[in-house]
Structure formats: structure tokens, C-alpha cells
């Protein structure tokens, strides 16, 4: 049993005979968004859920023994595919979805796999996934496609370093570096040897500069590549 601040939640297995209950929950969760698009159709919803229905990849989301949602998470060769993720409307906005998404992201990070999914256009789910680090990578007539790359400890350290620089928190930035770090500014070719020297250079920039972290990627050889825009 996993704990939230106020609710205990758990994942429970699904069997084939649960299909009708899952469909009813999906219809409740999607009714408003689909109606706004003029796409609410129970027959279409049934076909969509039945397509590729795999009980072994599906879990009920339970709170104190009550079923409040379900999730379909499939392990593909290249990614985790989040096919369905719904919280029953009476249980929404209680932090349950965030706790389940944390579980999904932790799995993906542990396996160094991206998470892919699609979300209905104009639904609140789009903002939810963006907050969780998903990037929009495509769109169809009715859905947006999203991808979240895995976050490793080294990626977290790189992000923490850039955030500390932006905040001018020099002790925090220094804590992200090892003593013998060497830095090369690509634009000028300038080399900076040592963590203290790198912090000193950045500390002399005037206040008001901004950092936009454009991309952080974990490379196959274990290194992390980051691309940042610095305006000063």
C-alpha cells in the first residue's frame, strides 16, 4: 500500500471480466472533454478501449479498497506506453493522479526508458502531462502526442546545477561539481580548470542574467549533454 498525504492508494490487478466497469469509468472521466469536441460516442469509446485491451498491463487504482481509476501501462522494446490513465471525476483533484504518475516516472527512470502517450486535445490532461516533464512531439486530428525522456541521477544533477546558477546560489552550484571539472566555452574556446574557478567566473556576471535550459539528454556512454541559452 502506497501513501499520499491523506489517502492510502494501491494498484490492483485487472481481469478480462472487468472490461465493462473500466469502460464505464472511462466514459465518466472523458465525457466533458469529448462533449466539448463533439466526439462523445459510447460505441467509439468501447472500440477504443477494446483495441489492444490487455489485462496483464492494466491496473485498477484503489483508494482504501475503493476503485477510483485505472491505468494501462505497456512495456514496449523502446519505451513505456501509457495507453490509458483515468481517475473517476469524484476522486479528481486530490493528488491521486500525481502519485500514480510519480510511480510511472520512477519505473521509467529506473529502466532508462522514455514514456509515450497521447492526450485528447483541449483536455486538462495536456497541462498535467506538461507539468510532469512530457514534451509535445506530434499531433493528430483529435490528439496530441507526448514523450518524456528518462531522468537519471546525473541528469538531475545537471538540472540542479543550472538552477543553482540561475538563482546565484554558489554553494549549491559548487556542490554539483567535482573538484577537477574542466569547462570549455564553445563560442570563445576559453577553458576553465577547476570547480572553484568555474563558480568564480559565473559569480562575476552581473545580476539579471537569465538561463533557459533548452535540452538535457542522457547519452549512451553515461555522459549528459545539456543545451542552455544564457542572456546577460
Language-model segment annotations:
Residues 98, 121-145:
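Conserved active-site alpha-helix within GNAT-family acetyltransferase domains
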Residues 170-222:
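A solvent-exposed, acidic/Ser-Thr-rich amphipathic alpha-helical stretch
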Residues 27-50, 189-190:
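Conserved GNAT-fold acetyl-CoA-binding loop/helix
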Residues 50-60, 67-69, 207-210:
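A short helix-loop-beta-strand connector motif used in the catalytic cores of GNAT acetyltransferases and
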